[in-house]
Amino acid sequence: MSTAAKRRLIRDFKRLTSDAPIGISGSPNPDNIMVWNAVIFGPPETPFEDGSFRLTLTFTDAYPNKPPTVRFISKMFHPNIYANGELCLDILQNRWSPTYDVAAILTSVQSLLNDPNPASPANVDAAQLFKENLKEYERRVKKTVELSWVDNADEIEAEVVEADEGSSS
C-alpha cells in the first residue's frame, strides 16, 4: 500500500472524527484502511429526512490523486444513484481534486440527496418521477427511508446476537 495514501487517509479520519459535518460519520475498516464504512443521515426537511444510509468508500494507492469508489449499501431511490449503489457525482469523476477529503466527499453525497441532477441520471425512473411527478418521487424516497431503518436494525440485531454468543462462552 502506498504510504502517501495511508498517511492521507489517517489524516482524513482524524479530521472527520474531530470536526465531523452534521449528519455524517465514517471510519476505516479495522482490517483495511483502504476500505471505509460510512453513514449519511438524510438531510432535514427533505424526503430523505430520518433515513440512515450506509455506504462504502474504496480507495486505491492513487488516493488522493484519484477519487475513491463510493457505493451505497442501503437501497436507494435517487436520480443519480445506480441500482448497484454507485453514484453519478461530478466530484467523483471529472471534477475530482486531491484537495477533497473524506468529509468533503460525504458532505457532497449528502447534498446530492436533496439536490439531484436529473439531467445526468443514473436511475432514469427516479429522474423522470423527480421531473414529472414530484409527489410520487417523494413517496418512493420515503419508502427508501423506511427500508434504511430495517437495514440498520438487522445489522444492530446481528451485532447484539454476536455479543451475546461471545459472552456466554
Swiss-Prot record:
It catalyses: S-ubiquitinyl-[E1 ubiquitin-activating enzyme]-L-cysteine + [E2 ubiquitin-conjugating enzyme]-L-cysteine = [E1 ubiquitin-activating enzyme]-L-cysteine + S-ubiquitinyl-[E2 ubiquitin-conjugating enzyme]-L-cysteine. Keywords: ATP-binding, Chromatin regulator, Cytoplasm, DNA damage, DNA repair, Nucleotide-binding, Nucleus, Sporulation, Transcription, Transcription regulation, Transferase, Ubl conjugation pathway. Pfam families: UQ_con. The active site is at 88 (glycyl thioester intermediate). GO terms for biological process: cellular response to unfolded protein; cytoplasm protein quality control by the ubiquitin-proteasome system; DNA repair; DNA-templated transcription termination; double-strand break repair via homologous recombination; ERAD pathway; error-free postreplication DNA repair; error-free translesion synthesis. Catalyzes the covalent attachment of ubiquitin to other proteins. Plays a role in transcription regulation by catalyzing the monoubiquitination of histone H2B to form H2BK123ub1. H2BK123ub1 gives a specific tag for epigenetic transcriptional activation and is also a prerequisite for H3K4me and H3K79me formation. Also involved in postreplication repair of UV-damaged DNA, in N-end rule-dependent protein degradation and in sporulation. This is Ubiquitin-conjugating enzyme E2 2. It comes from Cryptococcus neoformans var. neoformans serotype D (strain JEC21 / ATCC MYA-565) (Filobasidiella neoformans). The gene is UBC2.
